[in-house]
């Protein structure tokens, strides 16, 4: 059964109104009907330029005094204000107004209020007036509070308000009220990681998921201690001098706007519209991005390790996190930090590459390259050179492949290999591979009992020998087919390297 209390609690969310905007259809200056435009300008009490009595336009109608055309931007702001719906986005400030009223004819004592915000993972206290409780709460008396908190967790959030008071009979009573609201993600973030040797490229795509427009003030990547990051997005490739000139122009335009005055005529219309339109210019910063509803923007970050040879930077899964700051069209600031962005490491035990390839290679003259082998595991590896002969064409191995020593954990060895070019032109160094052998096992001499030695050895018949031979041939064929379809896990092939092979003699003799 619901209990009637002497106090009444009301909670209202404080939010700014929403100004509906109209997206205009922009067109070229030459396509504008000047007579129709001049009529519409008079009806809206704003003129873009001087129009003579015949309806024709002069040269200053859409062109400023300095000869530069004036850009027409359709703001489309209407004069009606509509209250914003109960939508709140992650990173915004949640603000609410709480009113506690005594609607009974009795006086209550020791009134205090506790407010907390509950999420799926935490409870955040917002208000606790127990230490400053109201001694007497007369009939008709009310007490108002304003609480605010940055929303840092999406999903269902619950505002819990607990009221405690003492009745005239001395009985202590309390009641609670719960207010649920949904926190939505303002941005849809999609990331893609391109993992290359000694460098990682992070591609981030931001999409505006709100019901209005957003101004992305900044998006920064905060790497972990083992990495450095650099923003290499397209807009950040401008010269510093150009950015400095743009900033100076923006400051100059802002100063001019602050000094402007609106001059009204007898009818209440603006007289100095030409001066206003000449000085009012949309100034944007290279770092600020305007995103309409449903629009997206891509960013690119270059992440490099501070120490290339550091094992922790090579094996580190997390790279860092993104810090995004934006503003709504009312200037309300929002901030969002993502969780740690992780990459997928190449789980291969060994890394093979060819280095120190000569710049000039002569036809039918041997040359040497360096095979670099890196043990990326925590155990000792036993590698062996292998050749994929069906891939080798223009350049082949000149001699026998050397025998490799065991590679210690997290270490690198380099081996010199002699190659021999057979064909001129653009050729590929390909077909060299590494096979990891099983670690050597210490041999154990088997012991046989006397009973086993005394048993006679049965000789197989001719039919059994033929049957075993056929079965072994079938098994060998199946193994060869499986090896052709998919190489074993302990087989690592070097990446192909393109190189140019020149003729040995500078002069070619026609035959």
From Swiss-Prot:
Matching Pfam families, A to Z?
TRAPPC13_C (PF23643), TRAPPC13_M (PF23647), TRAPPC13_N (PF06159)
Q: Which InterPro entries match?
A: TRAPPC13, TRAPPC13_C, TRAPPC13_M, TRAPPC13_N
Superkingdom of this protein's organism: Eukaryota
Q: Which GO terms describe its cellular component?
A: TRAPPIII protein complex
Q: Which family does it belong to?
A: Belongs to the TRAPPC13 family.
Protein's UniProt name = Trafficking protein particle complex subunit 13 homolog
The root-end lineage is:
Eukaryota, Amoebozoa, Evosea, Eumycetozoa, Dictyostelia
């Amino acid at each position: 059964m619901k209990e009637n209390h002497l106090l009444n609690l009301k909670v209202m969310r404080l939010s700014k109104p929403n100004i509906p905007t109209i997206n205009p259809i922009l067109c070229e200056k030459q396509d504008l009907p000047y007579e129709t435009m001049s009529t519409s300008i008079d009806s809206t009490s704003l003129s873009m330029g001087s129009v003579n009595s015949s309806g024709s336009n002069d040269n200053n109608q859409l062109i400023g005094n300095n000869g530069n055309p004036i850009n027409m931007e359709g703001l489309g702001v209407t004069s009606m204000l509509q209250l914003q719906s109960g939508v709140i986005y992650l990173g915004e400030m949640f603000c609410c107004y709480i009113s506690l009223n005594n609607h009974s004819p009795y006086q209550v004592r020791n009134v205090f209020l506790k407010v907390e915000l509950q999420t799926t993972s935490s409870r955040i206290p917002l208000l606790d007036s127990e230490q400053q409780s109201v001694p007497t709460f007369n009939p008709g008396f009310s007490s108002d509070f304003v609480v605010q908190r940055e929303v840092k967790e999406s999903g269902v959030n619950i505002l819990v308000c607990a009221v405690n008071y003492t009745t005239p009979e001395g009985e202590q009573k309390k009641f609670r009220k719960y207010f649920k609201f949904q926190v939505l993600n303002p941005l849809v973030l999609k990331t893609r990681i391109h993992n290359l040797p000694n460098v990682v490229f992070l591609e981030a795509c931001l999409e505006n998921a709100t019901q209005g427009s957003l101004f992305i003030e900044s998006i920064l990547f905060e790497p972990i201690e083992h990495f450095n990051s650099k923003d290499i997005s397209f807009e950040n490739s401008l010269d510093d001098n150009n950015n400095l000139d743009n900033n100076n122009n923006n400051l100059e335009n802002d100063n001019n706007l602050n000094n402007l005055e609106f001059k009204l005529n007898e009818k209440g219309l603006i007289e100095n519209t030409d001066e206003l339109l000449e000085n009012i210019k949309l100034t944007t910063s290279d770092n600020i991005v305007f995103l309409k509803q449903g629009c997206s923007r891509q960013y690119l970050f270059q992440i490099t390790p501070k120490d290339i040879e550091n094992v922790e930077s090579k094996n580190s899964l997390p790279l860092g996190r993104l810090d995004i700051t934006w503003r709504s069209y009312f200037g309300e600031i929002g901030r969002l930090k993502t969780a740690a962005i992780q990459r997928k490491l190449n789980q291969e035990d060994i890394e093979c590459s060819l280095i120190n390839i000569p710049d000039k290679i002569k036809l039918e003259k041997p040359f040497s390259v360096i095979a670099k082998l890196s043990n990326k595991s925590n155990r000792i590896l036993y590698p062996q050179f292998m050749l994929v002969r069906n891939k080798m064409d223009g350049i082949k191995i000149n001699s026998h492949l050397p025998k490799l020593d065991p590679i210690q954990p997290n270490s690198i060895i380099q081996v010199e290999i002699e190659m021999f070019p057979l064909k001129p032109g653009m050729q590929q160094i390909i077909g060299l591979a590494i096979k990891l052998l099983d670690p050597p096992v210490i041999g154990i001499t088997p012991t046989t009992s006397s009973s086993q030695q005394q048993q006679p050895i049965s000789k197989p018949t001719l039919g059994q020998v033929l049957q075993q031979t056929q079965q072994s041939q079938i098994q060998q064929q199946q193994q060869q087919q499986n090896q052709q379809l998919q190489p074993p896990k302990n087989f690592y092939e070097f990446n192909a390297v393109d190189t140019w092979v020149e003729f040995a003699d500078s002069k070619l003799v026609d035959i």
